[in-house]
Curated annotation (Swiss-Prot):
A Pfam match: AnmK
Domain of life of the source: Bacteria
Protein name as catalogued: Anhydro-N-acetylmuramic acid kinase
InterPro entries found in the cross-reference section: Anhydro_N_Ac-Mur_kinase, ATPase_NBD
Family according to the record: Belongs to the anhydro-N-acetylmuramic acid kinase family.
UniProt function note: Catalyzes the specific phosphorylation of 1,6-anhydro-N-acetylmuramic acid (anhMurNAc) with the simultaneous cleavage of the 1,6-anhydro ring, generating MurNAc-6-P. Is required for the utilization of anhMurNAc either imported from the medium or derived from its own cell wall murein, and thus plays a role in cell wall recycling.
Keyword Kinase applies: yes
Taxonomic source organism: Prochlorococcus marinus (strain MIT 9313)
GO process annotations (BP): 1,6-anhydro-N-acetyl-beta-muramic acid catabolic process; amino sugar metabolic process; peptidoglycan turnover
Gene from which the chain derives: anmK
């Protein structure tokens, strides 16, 4: 089956559209990537999405117009990726505007904004959306959902295999080896903390809105990270939590950035960006070290995807902190860094069609596995 996958992550820079074909066993599918298109959000829309994700109030009309605009960009990306309408099905994550993990006093909740019936009508094809709701209803975190797709798409090797996505948030997948005593272990995955979210916001402030991110890590490369501050930040509660755990821009957004910058008052702008960049690498490295202490698991290789994989300073910080692991860009395995999450949600939509569970209780904390997504058909 040919499926379109549409993804817009916490970086809120636009929509990645993937056209893929799946066949065979759902747990070990044969797949091919047929096309990839990335459509950026117009700047005013991007800024509204970022603001909404940080709790800045919108009135009812603004929320309505935001959901409509997001849906229209998703449709634009889908049509650009699949102009001949080859796909039979569309899987769309929507745009996360708020994510609240479960706490002792309330259930978890997550909102991915999208007008799915409108998208289905614009594309004249069924759309599977709202992928997180079933896991949340079962007491799970609702995230991350990509690890099971990672395991199915990338497969197993002779040892543990790590997959790291560096979007707005850094999230990890650990795939068990194909042989040996750990071959029966479960796939693991969780959110580590900020990847690009704080860096991007800092660069936008520094450039007075002229830059949306640190292109090629140029700003960070001209500065020096403050290691004592990073070590102090790593002791914060979230970074000490064991999995399952998930987070988003609502936790690591503008308010968090401003608090951290207050702790760096006499530092140059370049040093601030360098510190935030090194911090993003450090939260991942610390989680991998803690994984080894808890589970005696250390991946042989770490496959890196997402926009942060294009930042050479961030990648070098990871190499320095994750010694003993081979770092690979997902491009080296034939999977574009920009395609990974769109491909994952195309797979989740295919799984929905097959009524195959897409979550893993060991990862999200849900009571049981469940078929994910809600289907909207053209009117």
């Amino acid at each position: 089956m040919r499926v379109l996958g549409l993804m817009s992550g916490t970086s809120a820079d636009g929509v990645d559209a993937v056209l893929a074909e799946f066949s065979g066993s759902p747990s070990e599918p044969k797949w091919s990537l047929l096309n990839l298109v990335c459509i950026p959000y117009p700047e005013d829309l991007r800024q509204t999405v970022v603001n909404a994700g940080q709790g800045i109030k919108l009135n009812s009309c603004e929320w309505l117009e935001l959901s409509e605009s997001i849906t229209e960009v998703h449709a634009q990306a889908a049509l650009a990726c699949d102009p001949r309408a080859q796909a039979e099905l569309v899987g769309s994550h929507g745009q996360t505007v708020w994510h609240r993990p479960p706490q002792k006093n309330h259930r978890g909740a997550s909102w991915q904004i999208l007008q799915a019936p409108l998208l289905a009508e614009l594309l004249k094809r069924p759309v599977v959306h709202d992928f997180r709701a079933a896991d949340l209803a079962l007491g799970g975190q609702g995230a991350p959902l990509v690890p099971m797709a990672d395991a199915a798409l990338l497969g197993r090797v002779g040892g543990w295999r790590g997959v790291l996505n560096l979007g707005g948030i850094a999230n990890l997948t650990l795939i068990p080896p194909r042989s040996g005593p750990d071959r029966l272990a479960s796939v693991m995955g969780w959110d580590c903390g900020p990847a690009n979210s704080l860096i991007d916001l800092a660069v936008e402030q520094i450039s007075k809105g002229k830059l949306a991110f640190d292109h090629d890590g140029i700003i960070a490369a001209s500065g020096h990270p403050h290691t004592t501050t990073i070590e102090r930040w790593l002791k914060e509660t979230f970074f000490q939590l064991p999995p399952p755990k998930s987070t988003g821009r609502e936790q690591f957004g503008l308010a968090d950035l401003e608090q951290r910058l207050k702790e760096l008052p006499k530092m140059s702008r370049a040093n601030r960006v360098a510190t935030l960049t090194a911090f993003s690498a450090a939260v991942v490295a610390q989680d991998l070290d803690n994984l080894h202490l808890r589970n005696l698991v250390r991946p042989l290789e770490l496959i890196v995807a997402g926009g942060g994989s294009r930042n050479p300073v961030l990648m070098n910080e990871l190499r320095q902190r994750c010694r003993g692991m081979r770092l690979l860009n997902s491009d080296e395995l034939g999977l574009s860094a920009e395609a990974r999450e769109g491909l994952a949600f195309a797979l989740l939509a295919w799984w929905h069609c097959l009524q195959y569970p897409g979550n893993a209780p060991a990862i999200t904390g849900a009571k049981r596995a469940a078929v994910l997504g809600v289907r909207a058909d053209p009117a």
